[in-house]
Amino acid sequence: MFKLLSFANAPAIVRANQKDSYFESRLHNQLLDVVKAIKGSHFVHKYPEELRTLATALYLCLTTLVGSKTLGEEYVDLVYVSRDGRKIPKFASRFGFVVAYVLFPYAVRQLLQKLKAQQSRLAQLVSGVSYMNVMDLLNLHLALFYFTGKYYQFAKRLFGLRYAFGYRVDKNQQRARGNYELLGLLIIFQTVFKNVANLRKLWGATKTVQDSGDLIYRFRDQTSDVIDLADPKVLPYLPEASRTCMLCLSPMKDPSCGECGHVFCWKCVLDWVKERQECPLCRAKMRESQLLPLR
């Protein structure tokens, strides 16, 4: 197809998407009624996300995948064109868009839920960071759309599906964007301010840990004598079997313990806690600020 049609602008694409969201919601409700009649309410409450994903897949498979317009596209009179606007997208591009738009978000949500269900610190960190990064990227992509009018969904950008008006428009109508550029600026400012606030919180938490460590270091520097348990006269209340550090396997120097009560060399346990905030023996939580030198 030659480039005869004008690319659609942001207001028209947003109106089409709003209409599609409305009809997709109605299809979802009708699907729930059918499934509830067949499988019962328990099944519907057990798989709400899967049923919503199925409704979206049905809507797009009955329209975009087979080359027909969605109801929102019919309402605004939009057609799909290639990136350069000269061709109609092939079936492979439409199929890729449907799969990416429907299944990829579902797969990501399932993965994040599994990571969150795991109690390991790494799993919680990855799930939290991944969710924040994905949301920030989607917000920035939406802001880019408000500025350019291209690719409302990221999946359409990935497979090169652009919208064009199904009729000829004058230049004034084509340039009309309303206040969408202002919305794009607001989204960018919101994302930046949110991340700056998160960085400040992270910096504050790191600073607190560093300050706690500095206080402990200054405390140790102020004590001139090193407490060496190789001398049985030093801290005689400690039994012989408990005077060896389990980290360096030598008699303890400057013995220190955490809230769990296990005792180690000051330098050994401090180096350990900097890498892993847990007791080397019982895995109880242990931080620099919680270490207590024994006297």
From Swiss-Prot:
A Gene Ontology biological process term: protein ubiquitination
Subcellular localization(s) per the UniProt record: Peroxisome membrane
Broadest EC class assigned to this enzyme: transferase
Top-level taxon: Eukaryota
Protein's name according to its UniProt entry: Peroxisome biogenesis factor 10
Organism: Pichia angusta (Yeast)
Mode of membrane association: Multi-pass membrane protein
Entry keywords, A to Z: Membrane, Metal-binding, Peroxisome, Peroxisome biogenesis, Protein transport, Transferase, Transmembrane, Transmembrane helix, Transport, Ubl conjugation pathway, Zinc, Zinc-finger
Protein function: E3 ubiquitin-protein ligase component of a retrotranslocation channel required for peroxisome organization by mediating export of the PEX5 receptor from peroxisomes to the cytosol, thereby promoting PEX5 recycling. The retrotranslocation channel is composed of PEX2, PEX10 and PEX12; each subunit contributing transmembrane segments that coassemble into an open channel that specifically allows the passage of PEX5 through the peroxisomal membrane. PEX10 also regulates PEX5 recycling by acting as a E3 ubiquitin-protein ligase.
A Pfam cross-reference name: Pex2_Pex12
Family: Belongs to the pex2/pex10/pex12 family.
Transmembrane stretches, start-end: 10-39, 41-62, 109-120, 123-148, 180-199
Residue intervals annotated with topology Peroxisomal matrix: 1-9, 63-108, 149-179
InterPro entries named in the record: PEX2/10, Pex_N, Znf_RING, Znf_RING/FYVE/PHD, Znf_RING_CS
One GO term describing the cellular component: peroxisomal membrane
Catalytic reaction equation(s): S-ubiquitinyl-[E2 ubiquitin-conjugating enzyme]-L-cysteine + [acceptor protein]-L-lysine = [E2 ubiquitin-conjugating enzyme]-L-cysteine + N(6)-ubiquitinyl-[acceptor protein]-L-lysine
Record-linked PROSITE patterns: ZF_RING_1, ZF_RING_2
SUPFAM superfamilies xrefs: RING/U-box
Domain comment in the entry: The three subunits of the retrotranslocation channel (PEX2, PEX10 and PEX12) coassemble in the membrane into a channel with an open 10 Angstrom pore. The RING-type zinc-fingers that catalyze PEX5 receptor ubiquitination are positioned above the pore on the cytosolic side of the complex.
